Every structure is written in C-alpha cells, then in structure tokens.
Amino acid sequence: GTYTFDIKENVPQTQAGGMTYDAHTTKVTVNVVRDTEDFAKLKASVSYNSVTAGIATDKATFENSYSSSTEAEGGTSAEVKVNKILNGRPLKAGEFQFKLATRPTNGSNGTVIQEKQNQENGNISFDSLKYKTSNTAAGDTAIILSQAVRDGYAEKSPDQNGNTVYTLKYRIYEEAAEGTLPNGVSAVTNFYDFTVTVTDNGNG
C-alpha cells in the first residue's frame, strides 16, 4: 500500500530570541510492496517532497537561522559623547567640523561614517552606533558585524562564557585643513581613538 505523512518543525510557542524557524512542510510518501523473490517479505520505498517549494528531495531537511541586533529587545546601542572647547572667546554653533571614522587594525586609512558640527555648548552629537549580525536582523541603519570584520576594523572572538564578542575600533578627529577653521582660530591637532565592544549573548 501507499502511505503519506507530513513532517514539519514543531515551533515552540515561546520562541528563542533571534531565531527564525523553518516553516515549510515536507510530504513523505511510503510505498510498501511484497518482495517478488520472497513473498513473505515486504519492501518499502520512501520519497520526499517539499510541499512549500514543490521540490522532490532525498530527505526532509529543515534549516533555521539565528541573527542578533542591538535594536532587538534588550539590546543597547553605543552612544558617542564628544565635546569641543574653544579658548579665548565664546563658541558658536556649527563653527567646527568633526568626523567619525573606522580605524583598521592594519593602520590603513579608515572610512568616514559620520560628519557632525559642534553645538553652541560644545557638544558634538554623533548618531548612536548600532550593530547586527546579518542583513535580516533588526535595524535598517545598523552596521553588519561580519562586514566590519572583513573591512578590518573589527575583531571577532569568544568570551569566557562562550558568547561571541566583536571589538570595533574608531577614531574621531576635527577637520583642521586650511580654510576650514574660523579666522583667528588655530587648531590643536587632536584625534581620539576608542573601541566599541559588542557581545552576542545568544538571545538575539
């Protein structure tokens, strides 16, 4: 006789954070016939068909994926706090330009990812740095961590608890090229290097 079964993943009611479950169904057809050489024996053949994709396969395969983001519930983005000091006269809003750039570990020039001006109180408000592990994770403007590793300004390593840790290196500097500073102002050529540590605790 012929017997058919449906196989699908049992998705838990409380889903694991960051996990995307495989929702497809595979139909299994079992055909049982008598052995032509030994009538007392039965022989079974099995075929599989992915109902969702309409594709015949040699087995039932289910593939889940995991991704995480600082934009997911419980995640935190990196706030970058910078302040400009001008000696000799009051500071005006928008007088000075500042750049936030990646800092590759090989010493090569990084890529400028943000440009901001000072406020009247001297604060420079860079946008928060947000991160995710894949394109499908939350956060349209988040930096993809695997790409940061390939670009050379991030390193990936495990911590003592087995969590994945990314260490990203950045530099903030003031635009002090000729013609970019107000009259009578001379720059103290300074840049500030900092790192951001992102820990993926396995919960998205």
Show which residues each predicted segment covers.
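Solvent-exposed loop/turn and edge beta-strand elements of beta-rich ligand-binding domains
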Residues: 1-204
